[in-house]
Amino acid sequence: MKTRSKLAAGFLTLMSVATLAACSGKTSNGTNVVTMKGDTITVSDFYDQVKTSKAAQQSMLTLILSRVFDTQYGDKVSDKKVSEAYNKTAKGYGNSFSSALSQAGLTPEGYKQQIRTTMLVEYAVKEAAKKELTEANYKEAYKNYTPETSVQVIKLDAEDKAKSVLKDVKADGADFAKIAKEKTTATDKKVEYKFDSAGTTLPKEVMSAAFKLDKNGVSDVVSTVDSTTYKTSYYIIKVTDKTEKKSDWKSYKNRLKEVILKDKTSDRAFQNKVISKALEKANVKIKDKAFAGILSQYATTSGSSSLKK
């Protein structure tokens, strides 16, 4: 929920700002929000005070995206899907869910709206990615594709220990599989793996090292850093089998399709391009200069005026 909360934190924190600004038919900018001896605070006073804050900027951006994508793709995400996602998160947090929502500045309905907007954007990006399934892109993906490779892996937590184990496995007559099972620090004690270049079971550095080896080849120590914990792990790899790459890309069409779609949907530049097109289609125009820059990340090279003030 933390990632999605970042998307909508401003939306709920200052939802009242957007509401006050939009309700000119019900209240005027001079309507008093607070009265006190010798002074008043009007809607306009409040709006001018908060609109330049980071939270208000994020609030307005989230509100724009919510309105635009709901208008263009609203029928593609059902309430059932939103509820399922919401309930899954709630179940994961257990009794602390209400507290987690509160700390993130969210209400149940607000979080559901956030989930809905995220799903709508994801749908739009996936549909755009499908249009990238051209023969040229298939052939390009094929060039970078390595078919299934089988390996034995020893994972270690200390560099000096890894260097010591490396000497053991490279000694004449060494039984790599036996040493791997004895020495690996992997929590599941797993040492046998199969993967292609699109796999995610092992760090990319480990897979890349494996692809460079011949059958029965043993790597040097390969170090990786966990992007979440920043912990360094050390790997020693032995390739036990390699699948020869077929000459026709169509032999891997289904797998290459997965690769292309994954690459596109996870590409921030591609995501921004899709969002930019949706904003242009909606003819979004920023009327208050305080919010002039909130859509700059989605500006296209054509410099569409719809993304400007």
UniProtKB/Swiss-Prot annotation:
Keyword Membrane (UniProt): yes
Any Gene Ontology CC annotation: plasma membrane
Domain PpiC, first and last residues per copy: 146-241
GO biological process, one term: protein folding
Lipidation (S-diacylglycerol cysteine): 23
Catalysis performed (reactions): [protein]-peptidylproline (omega=180) = [protein]-peptidylproline (omega=0)
PROSITE patterns the UniProt entry points to: PPIC_PPIASE_2, PROKAR_LIPOPROTEIN
Topology of this chain in the membrane: Lipid-anchor
Cell compartments where the protein resides: Cell membrane
Pfam family, one: Rotamase_2
Recorded GO MF terms: peptidyl-prolyl cis-trans isomerase activity
Disulphide bond pairs: none
Lipid tethering residues (N-palmitoyl cysteine): 23
EC number: 5.2.1.8
Keywords from the named record: Cell membrane, Isomerase, Lipoprotein, Membrane, Palmitate, Rotamase, Signal
Signal peptide: 1-22
Task of the protein: Plays a major role in protein secretion by helping the post-translocational extracellular folding of several secreted proteins.
Similarity annotation: Belongs to the PrsA family.
Name this polypeptide is given: Foldase protein PrsA
Organism: Streptococcus agalactiae serotype V (strain ATCC BAA-611 / 2603 V/R)
Record lineage: Bacteria, Bacillati, Bacillota, Bacilli, Lactobacillales
